[in-house]
């Protein structure tokens, strides 16, 4: 990697990969950079709010299931707007999915990290850079109020639940040989 691509790689590692590795206990809090420790605060707050609202469960036993479920949820999440709050929801969702895979001992957490990395690189990074990059994300994380966090969590949940409900309906129709 060289030049601009290396800069983008570093941004994604700072914002996304570091938090996921911390969340799944692959690295300790002391191994986080000062920047990562700052954004960890808002992401932990998002995670706590999300946990109070709903228990997210996954059924992930293959690389294809991870890619399908992940892509479905995050595409729905960002289909009409990208903002820092939704990016926080995306990061927390990615971390939860990776932790599920690690806890299930199915050795697929690296697939989640790679899928999240690629989605951020190709779909979110251009927006992030045009909206101030790491500095603006840090400013957002330091100055978010409870209302905006709750609003973004509720929006994320509505998109997640809509996607999962749709998948459940499709599966039910398939089970009944209706499609």
Curated annotation (Swiss-Prot):
Keyword list, A-Z: Apoptosis, Early protein, Host endoplasmic reticulum, Host mitochondrion, Host-virus interaction, Inhibition of host apoptosis by viral BCL2-like protein, Inhibition of host autophagy by virus, Late protein, Modulation of host cell apoptosis by virus
Superkingdom in the source lineage: Viruses
Chief site of localization: host cell
SUPFAM superfamilies per UniProt: Bcl-2 inhibitors of programmed cell death
Subcellular location: Host mitochondrion; Host endoplasmic reticulum
Any single GO BP term: symbiont-mediated suppression of host apoptosis
Alphabetical list of PROSITE patterns matching this protein: BCL2_FAMILY, BH1, BH2
GO cellular component labels: host cell endoplasmic reticulum; host cell mitochondrion
InterPro entries: Bcl-2-like_sf, Bcl-2_BH1-3, Bcl-2_fam, Bcl2-like, Bcl2_BH1_motif_CS, Bcl2_BH2_motif_CS
Molecular function terms, GO-annotated: BH domain binding
One Pfam family it belongs to: Bcl-2
Induction of synthesis: Expressed in the early phase of the viral replicative cycle. Expressed in the late phase of the viral replicative cycle.
Motif BH2, residue numbers: 126-141
Short sequence motif named BH1, residue ranges: 76-95
UniProt subunit comment: Interacts with host BECN1 (via BH3 homology domain); this interaction allows the virus to inhibit BECN1, and thus autophagy. Interacts with host BID. Interacts with host BAX.
Family: Belongs to the Bcl-2 family.
Protein name: Apoptosis regulator Bcl-2 homolog
């Amino acid at each position: 990697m060289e030049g601009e691509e290396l800069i983008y790689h570093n941004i994604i590692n700072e914002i996304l990969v570091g938090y996921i590795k911390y969340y799944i206990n692959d690295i300790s809090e002391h191994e986080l950079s000062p920047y990562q420790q700052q954004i960890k605060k808002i992401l932990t707050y998002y995670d706590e709010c999300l946990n109070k609202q709903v228990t997210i469960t996954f059924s992930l036993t293959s690389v294809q299931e991870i890619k399908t479920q992940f892509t479905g949820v995050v595409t729905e999440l960002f289909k009409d707007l990208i903002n820092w709050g939704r990016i926080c929801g995306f990061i927390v969702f990615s971390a939860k999915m990776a932790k599920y895979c690690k806890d299930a001992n199915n050795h697929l957490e690296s697939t989640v990290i790679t899928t999240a990395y690629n989605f951020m690189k190709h779909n979110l990074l251009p927006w992030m850079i045009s909206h101030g990059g790491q500095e603006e994300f840090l400013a957002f994380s330091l100055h978010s109020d409870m209302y905006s966090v709750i609003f973004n969590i509720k929006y994320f949940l509505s998109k997640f639940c809509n996607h999962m409900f749709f998948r459940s309906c499709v599966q039910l129709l398939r089970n009944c040989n209706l499609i």
